[in-house]
Regions:
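Bacterial N-terminal signal peptides that target proteins for export
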Residues: 1-10
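Aromatic (phenylalanine/tyrosine) cluster motif
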Residues: 12-14
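N-terminal signal peptide c-region/cleavage motif recognized by signal peptidases
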Residues: 16-22
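Gly/Pro-enriched, hydrophobic low-complexity segments
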Residues: 27-55, 82, 95, 223-293, ...
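Solvent-exposed N-terminal domain segments of exported/luminal and surface proteins
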Residues: 27-249, 256
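Extended beta-strand-rich segments in extracellular/periplasmic secretory proteins, especially
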Residues: 179-228, 286-362, 372
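Long, C-terminal catalytic modules of enzymes
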Residues: 425-449
Length: 449
């Protein structure tokens, strides 16, 4: 049976999109009719999306800083559940990828809860954002950001590239450690957990560093080490991610314990296979999208109200893999969806370039600029994969933080789940690390920790 989904089978209705002219308001409205990051403060006309008030969710009992974040909205009940039987009723608020999941898996469902616009960030981040209009610019060619080292560069984006650079540079914390598990799931639901320990140091938008202390043209440092299974344990990946990739491309190195050698890894980019992902994601799928923007033309289509993963506290910590991982898709009783306004950005592969995905459609949360959903198409125009980013607000930071990341292959019926956490896995543990900890010479030591 042919399970390929074509764009002609599932037509995404853009009729409900807000026109760009109506949303490109003057920067003077930031913090007034617009939130500090450029979202509409007001509720929607139906009252199904509330106004944004900037309040930080309360800390429930049982909170363990950096590890366990209990659900501040645990008392909420689903408003309704979207199933394959009634998907047509709700299709105006669904993406093509979501509709395809219902067609592929008849037992798939979305539990839709009351909307909480809980994405909030530190005041210092808002303050730097307010200074960016007229100062922050795209670098020549659009493959980087210049004129600023902090805040959200383009709270009122003029085009698709500016919107994508908001997604790439959004505030994701400071310097921290995190533990997580990745599983590449077969069609029958089998998997071998791969356990990672990661360290990150964000330079752009860091509030622990004054602008003059932020390393020039560096977005972040990233170290990823595998601790299990035994056949992969000790492998380490190091990435130095530049801000303006027209100046300096991404630098990456790997350490293989069997060879006991550190090697440069120029292929850790674009559509080369992701670490231990069994071919189910590309390197630039990590975090739903990362890296250079030079292979696509990005179009800012407008805004749309979509059921997106949001406030996914039940899914984000203390999860048992055997309860969560099922054939075809995760156990959707762990997932929470809410109606939110998202920016729709359509990316089409430039002529003369190549990529596994000929087209990507991004759905960026208006309150955080995180990509919450992405639909990916192959060279024949067929819907190939769809991905979703579940997120929570870390109410002690505060910030909107991506947790479980899912990549569904609609053609093979397989999927990849990343950043699954159980027990006392660290979610966000602040760390004191220096540039030396992210130097290639440190990789051998990292592999034996």
């Amino acid at each position: 049976m042919n399970h390929r989904i074509t764009t002609s089978v599932i037509a995404f209705t853009f009729g409900a999109l807000t026109s760009l002219a109506a949303t490109a308001q003057d920067a003077s409205q930031l913090g007034k009719s617009l939130t500090p990051l450029g979202a509409e403060k007001a509720a929607n006309s139906a009252g199904t999306i509330p106004a944004w008030d900037g309040a930080v969710p309360a800390k429930p009992a049982g909170f363990k800083p950096g590890i366990l974040y209990p659900d501040p909205f645990a008392g909420d009940k689903p408003l309704f559940t979207v199933t394959a039987a009634d998907v047509e009723k709700y299709k105006d608020n669904l993406t093509p990828g979501q509709v395809a999941m219902f067609k592929k898996f008849p037992d798939y469902k979305l539990n839709v809860y009351p909307t909480h616009r809980s994405a909030v960030f530190p005041k210092g981040y808002y303050d730097e954002t307010l200074a960016n209009p007229g100062k922050a610019k795209l670098s020549p060619g659009g493959n980087g950001v210049i004129g600023t080292t902090g805040g959200l560069p383009f709270p009122i984006p003029a085009n698709g590239l500016e919107a994508i650079w908001n997604q790439l540079t959004r505030y994701r914390g400071e310097t921290y450690r995190t533990d997580n598990v990745q599983v590449a799931v077969t069609r029958t639901g089998d998997y071998t957990p791969v356990r990672f320990q990661n360290e990150l140091d964000f330079q752009f938008a860091s509030l622990n560093k004054k602008p003059a202390e932020r390393i020039d043209n560096l977005l972040f440092y990233f170290v990823q080490r595998i601790v299990a299974p035994a056949r992969l344990a000790g492998q380490v990946l190091l990435v130095h991610e530049p801000l303006d990739q027209t100046k300096v491309p991404r630098s990456a190195w790997t350490y293989n314990p069997g060879q006991r050698r550190v090697r440069q890894a120029p292929n850790v980019a674009y559509d080369n296979p992701g670490t231990a992902a069994d071919g189910l994601r590309t390197n630039d799928d990590f975090g739903l999208y990362n890296g250079a923007t030079d292979r696509y033309d990005f179009t800012l289509v407008g805004k749309k109200e979509i059921f997106v993963p949001y406030n996914s506290y039940k899914l984000s910590s203390g999860v048992n893999l055997t309860d969560l991982i099922k054939p075809g898709h995760i156990n959707q009783d762990f997932a929470r969806y809410e109606l939110h306004r998202v920016w729709v950005v359509d990316a089409k592969l430039k002529k003369g370039t190549s990529h596994l995905y000929a087209r990507r459609t991004f759905y960026l949360d208006e309150d955080s600029w995180a990509a919450l959903l992405i639909d990916k198409y192959d060279g024949r125009g067929e819907l190939y994969r769809t991905a979703e980013q579940h997120s929570i607000t870390l109410y002690d930071v505060p910030m909107f933080f991506g947790t479980v990341e899912l990549h569904y292959d609609l053609q093979s019926g397989r999927y990849l789940a990343l950043s699954v956490r159980s027990g006392d896995d660290k979610m966000y543990e602040p760390a004191k690390l220096t540039a030396a900890d992210f130097a290639p010479a440190s990789l051998r030591e990292a592999g034996v920790r």
